[in-house]
Every structure is written in structure tokens, then in C-alpha cells.
């Protein structure tokens, strides 16, 4: 075993594990405050996940006000107030501008580099690190964080399995290893094992912002590639057959209505865009609802109902259909559907309603019209599972926030250990929130190390 210990250097030595968004900012800020900083990245390149974020455009942050911003993290959002107080959106944008990155605001408040190129952001952070003389070591895997008497002493690392282990002395370690998604970028969940080995509790990991697999794979395949805009996705804690139609109450009042079952619990309901894939459903609104659906699956069956005409209530849709049938009575059922649905959904709808495709509109009975309306308001799928964690955009779960001081990002168990980014139990919707959390917690961890 070889040692790497600074000789004649009175500065505090900080080892940052992980060269992603939070790790780079943490390393640069700690060095800026006077520490000797060694940044360890197990892949051959810094910022690999940053380079693919936002479809390689890098959705840096969001323009929403602080209160709305915090709400995007759910019940754990309050944990971030301290980090955002030290380093928030304007601070991030000012830092990037200092290194030549201009930004722009797009729909939903999403902020991107003006160049639409994540490489410009990664290059800016690399210049930030170089300016403050951060020692960067790529292709180095940390195998253990060393502790004595509940205090950090350093880390063990090695280049590969055949190389000798190297002990790096450290006064402090910032764990910035990210989550367990996008493993090709180096995010393979190593940090969870390191933290657990030191006694930290790991909140169970689940995929978040992830497409969902349905049981009705043949139906999904028949609609594969269909993109749906301005639809409402409703998720229920029940099998699809147990969802009442649109005429049922929208929520269970505890009383129900005569002749009908109370509507099952609604897990979540969102309006937006989604798509049908060969295995199930994806797209923005699906991703945003996925974590609640994943968590609900642990408690029993989950189904979804797609409202393809959310702007119309049940009676309005019935009237719309009747008007179409009256005005175009000689048109076939297939041609009527062509005015209501994307092309690839027409044949599945014909099969599901059981109405002959060539039946003239004026011959469609009231019961058949109700069947059509029912499908338009509630196209149902049973959810089998999410895609694997490796296919998710972010990881839900991680190091328990109860064991981290939100004022400093310091471990409450081990002196000299700090956390930042996705390794902690923090996750949010898409829109730049997860990157901002990584940047802000990385900055606060570095500030705290300096203190």
C-alpha cells in the first residue's frame, strides 16, 4: 500500500469523491476558499452525466420563485433552504457567465446554456477547477472511506484491480457520487455503499422520472410511437377493471352514489404530454407521476386511465359525438374516429369498442356512443412495473437526510464527512431542479469544509 500525504502543506486537505455537477462545484469552491483539493472521478472524464442531461442541452436550473422551487422536491424540500440561501440560481448563472456561458429561459422556466450545448457548461467548470488549482485524478475508484474515532482520516483508492491501493490523507471528504441511474456515466451507486459502511441509513432506492411497463403489452405495441398532447393521466390504487367510468364521482366522498361503487383512491392526476411505447407509457407527464406510482405499487395494484378529451366533461363529449354522428351520418365509424384520434389509435379503438369499422355513423346506437365516450375519457392500462433503475433519469432514496445537517451538509455521524447531490435522499421533477440541488449542496459542503 502506498501513501499520498502532503508534505509541508499547512492547508486543509479535502478529497471530493465524484466529478459530476455537485462534485465539480464543491471542489472548485473548497479550493477557492484555500483548501488543497483532490477531485477523484472513477471514469475517464469529468461531468459525464452533465453532458447528457437535458438531452445534451443541460437544463441547468429554473426561473421559478424560491417557494415554488422548494415545492418541487416534495416533503424533503425544506432540507434545501440552507443550501439555497448560500448558493442559488443567480449565483450559479453568475459563475457560469464569468466563464463564458450565457443562458436563456425557455417554457416552464427551464434555463439552458444559450448554445444548447452541455459541453460548454462542462468546459466552464473545468476552467473553474483549473483556475483554483484543484488536483484532478480521473480513472480512480475509491474503495473505502477511512475513519478513526468517528473522524475522517482519508480514502483508499486504486486505478484498477491489479494496481496497488493508495491511501489519500484527508481532513475532510465530500461524497458527491450521484445516484444509481445512467450507469454508463459512472453513476453506479457506489456512494450508497460507502455511506452505509460508515453507519449511515440508506432510504430504499427507487427509480424516479422513469417510463412504466404495462400489462397490456399487445395494446401498447399496437399504439407504439403515438404522442399525446393535452391529455390527463389519472393513476389509481386498483386494477383497471375497478375504475368506474367518468360518470362516477371524481373522488371518494365516503358516501358513493346509488348503484355505483365509490371511485378508488386517486394516486395522482396530471395534465400534459405523454406517449405510448412498445412496453407501456412514457413522456413528460408519465415521468412526473412515475415515482408516486412506483411507491404505490408496493401497496397493491396500480392502474392508469388516460383522458384523451380532458377539456370536455362526460355530457359535453356525448353531445360532441352525437353532433358528429348527426352531421356526418353517412361516414363510417372509422372516418369518425379519424377526427378524434391519432391514426395509430384508430384500429385499437375499433377493436376495443367492438363496433364494425364500416358502420355508418347514423346507425351507431346510444349504448355504442357511450362505449366510445368511455374509452375516450378512460383508456386504461394496468401498471406492471417501472423500467429498471438504470433506465431512470434520477434516483429516489439515498442517504437519510435525518443524518445530515442541512446547515452544513455535514454528516451527523462522522466528523469531516460531507454530502452533496443525488447521493442524498433528494429528488425532484424535471425542469432543472435536480441539477440546482446538486450545485447548491456542493457549494454549501465546500463552504462548511472551509469553516
Descriptions of predicted regions:
Residues 137-140, 144, 347-427:
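A glycine-rich dinucleotide-binding beta-alpha-beta segment and adjacent secondary-structure elements
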Residues 31-55:
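Glycine-rich FAD pyrophosphate-binding loop
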Residues 15-17, 155, 167-181, 195-196, ...:
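Short hydrophobic core segments
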Residues 12-39, 445-450:
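N-terminal Rossmann-like FAD-binding beta1-loop-alpha1 element of flavoenzymes
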Residues 10-12, 161-172, 269-272:
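Core beta-strand elements of the Rossmann-like FAD/NAD(P) dinucleotide-binding domain
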Residues 43-46, 51-52, 66-67, 201-204, ...:
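An anion/pyrophosphate-binding glycine-rich loop and adjacent beta-alpha core
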Residues 146-167, 173:
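Conserved beta-strand-loop-beta-strand element in the redox core of flavoprotein oxidoreductases
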Residues 172-218:
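Glycine-rich loop(s) and the adjacent beta-strand/alpha-helix scaffold that form part
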Amino acid at each position: 500500500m502506498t501513501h499520498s500525504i502532503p508534505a509541508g502543506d499547512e492547508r486543509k486537505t479535502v478529497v471530493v469523491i465524484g466529478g459530476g455537477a455537485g462534485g465539480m462545484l464543491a471542489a472548485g469552491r473548497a479550493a477557492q476558499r484555500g483548501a488543497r483539493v483532490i477531485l477523484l472521478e472513477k471514469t475517464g472524464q469529468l461531468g459525464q452525466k452533465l453532458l447528457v442531461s437535458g438531452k445534451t442541452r443541460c437544463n441547468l436550473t429554473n426561473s421559478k420563485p424560491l417557494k415554488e422551487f422548494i415545492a418541487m422536491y416534495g416533503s424533503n424540500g425544506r432540507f434545501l433552504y440552507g443550501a439555497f440561501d448560500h448558493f442559488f440560481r443567480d449565483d450559479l448563472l453568475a459563475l457560469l457567465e464569468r466563464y463564458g456561458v450565457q443562458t436563456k429561459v425557455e417554457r416552464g422556466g427551464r434555463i439552458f446554456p444559450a448554445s444548447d450545448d452541455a459541453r460548454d457548461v462542462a468546459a466552464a467548470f473545468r476552467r473553474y477547477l483549473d483556475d483554483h488549482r484543484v488536483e484532478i485524478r480521473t480513472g480512480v475508484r475509491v474503495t473505502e472511506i477511512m475513519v478513526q474515532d468517528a473522524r475522517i482520516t482519508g480514502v483508499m483508492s486504486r486505478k484498477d484491480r491489479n494496481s496497488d491501493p493508495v491511501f489519500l490523507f484527508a481532513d475532510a471528504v465530500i461524497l458527491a457520487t450521484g445516484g444509481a441511474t445512467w450507469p454508463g456515466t459512472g453513476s453506479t451507486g457506489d456512494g450508497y455503499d460507502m455511506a452505509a459502511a460508515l453507519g449511515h441509513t440508506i432510504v430504499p432506492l427507487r427509480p424516479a422520472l422513469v417510463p412504466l411497463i404495462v400489462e397490456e403489452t399487445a395494446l401498447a405495441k399496437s399504439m407504439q410511437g403515438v404522442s399525446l398532447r393535452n391529455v390527463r393521466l389519472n393513476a389509481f390504487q386498483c386494477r383497471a377493471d375497478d375504475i368506474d367510468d367518468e360518470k362516477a364521482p371524481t373522488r371518494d366522498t365516503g358516501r358513493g352514489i346509488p348503484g355505483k361503487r365509490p371511485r378508488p383512491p386517486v394516486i395522482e392526476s396530471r395534465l400534459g404530454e405523454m406517449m405510448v411505447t412498445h412496453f407501456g407509457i412514457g413522456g413528460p407527464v408519465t415521468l412526473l407521476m412515475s415515482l408516486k406510482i412506483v411507491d404505490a405499487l408496493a401497496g397493491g395494484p396500480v392502474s392508469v386511465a388516460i383522458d384523451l378529451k380532458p377539456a370536455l366533461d362526460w355530457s359535453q363529449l356525448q353531445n360532441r359525438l352525437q353532433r358528429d354522428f348527426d352531421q356526418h351520418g353517412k361516414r363510417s365509424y372509422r372516418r369518425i374516429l379519424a377526427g378524434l384520434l391519432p391514426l395509430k389509435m384508430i384500429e385499437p379503438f375499433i377493436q376495443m369498442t367492438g363496433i364494425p369499422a364500416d358502420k355508418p355513423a347514423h346507425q351507431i346506437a346510444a349504448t355504442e356512443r357511450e362505449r366510445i365516450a368511455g374509452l375516450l375519457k378512460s383508456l386504461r392500462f394496468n401498471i406492471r412495473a417501472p423500467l429498471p433503475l438504470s433506465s431512470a433519469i434520477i434516483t429516489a432514496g439515498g442517504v437519510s437526510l435525518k443524518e445530515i445537517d442541512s446547515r452544513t451538509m455535514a454528516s451527523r455521524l462522522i466528523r469531516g464527512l460531507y454530502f452533496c447531490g443525488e447521493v442524498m435522499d433528494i429528488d425532484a421533477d424535471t425542469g432543472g431542479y435536480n441539477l440546482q440541488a446538486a450545485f447548491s449542496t456542493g457549494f454549501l459542503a465546500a463552504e462548511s469544509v472551509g469553516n
